[in-house]
């Protein structure tokens, strides 16, 4: 018999990881709700534990192109329905405050062997963001590159029509 997942328990464990992360602890509490609750509701997260204690967490949203643009324009703009709107996977959160990022990375590559993910990576000092690409451990690298190129082409084609696109990393 499998144990039913308690969303409040997961939220508490993720909140503890946020508080333990030098980057996340500086963010407003509203971002915890925006970034974590939809992930729990849609079961689009991984929470790694060691000896019963949380050590790492990541969440992702499966966006359509419209919501991808919305997310890049304002990372705090996604609502619950956006998280399951398409097949363009974005890591929303990646938290490993105790040095377990490699374990989380391996878990994701092993458990999502044919999947593609992208993420906004922010340098905490300069606050400069960039889009990074990740793929599962079994997908052909050339195929992954081709799909990522197609994603970028579609994204850039749509952005040409956006007059007020600002690529915001935090709420103003």
Swiss-Prot record:
GO terms of molecular function: N-acyltransferase activity; protein homodimerization activity
Pfam families, alphabetized: HlyC
Entry superkingdom: Bacteria
Translocase in keyword set: no
Disulfide bonds, paired cysteine numbers: none
Alphabetized UniProt keyword annotations: Acyltransferase, Cytolysis, Cytoplasm, Hemolysis, Transferase
Keyword Cytoplasm in record: yes
GO-annotated biological processes: killing of cells of another organism; toxin metabolic process
EC number, UniProt record: 2.3.1.-
Quaternary structure annotation from Swiss-Prot or TrEMBL: Homodimer.
Chain's role: Protein-lysine acyltransferase that catalyzes fatty acylation of the protoxin, thereby converting it to the active toxin.
Full protein name: RTX-I toxin-activating lysine-acyltransferase ApxIC
Organism of provenance: Actinobacillus pleuropneumoniae (Haemophilus pleuropneumoniae)
Name of encoding gene: apxIC
């Amino acid at each position: 018999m499998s144990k039913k997942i308690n969303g409040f328990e997961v939220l508490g464990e993720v909140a503890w990881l946020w508080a333990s992360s030098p980057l996340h602890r500086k963010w407003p509490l509203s971002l915890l709700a925006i970034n974590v609750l939809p992930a729990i509701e849609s079961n689009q997260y991984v929470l790694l534990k060691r000896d019963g204690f949380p050590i790492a967490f990541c969440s992702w949203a499966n966006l359509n192109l419209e919501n991808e643009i919305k997310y890049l324009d304002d990372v705090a703009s996604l609502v619950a329905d956006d998280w399951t709107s398409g097949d363009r996977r974005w890591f929303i959160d990646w938290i490993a405050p105790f040095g377990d990022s490699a374990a989380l990375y391996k878990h994701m590559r092993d458990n999502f062997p044919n999947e593609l993910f992208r993420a906004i990576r922010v340098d905490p000092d300069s606050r400069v963001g960039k889009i990074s690409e990740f793929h599962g451990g079994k997908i052909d690298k050339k195929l992954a590159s081709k799909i990522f190129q197609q994603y970028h082409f579609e994204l850039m084609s749509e952005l040409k029509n956006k007059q007020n696109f600002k690529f915001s990393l935090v709420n103003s």
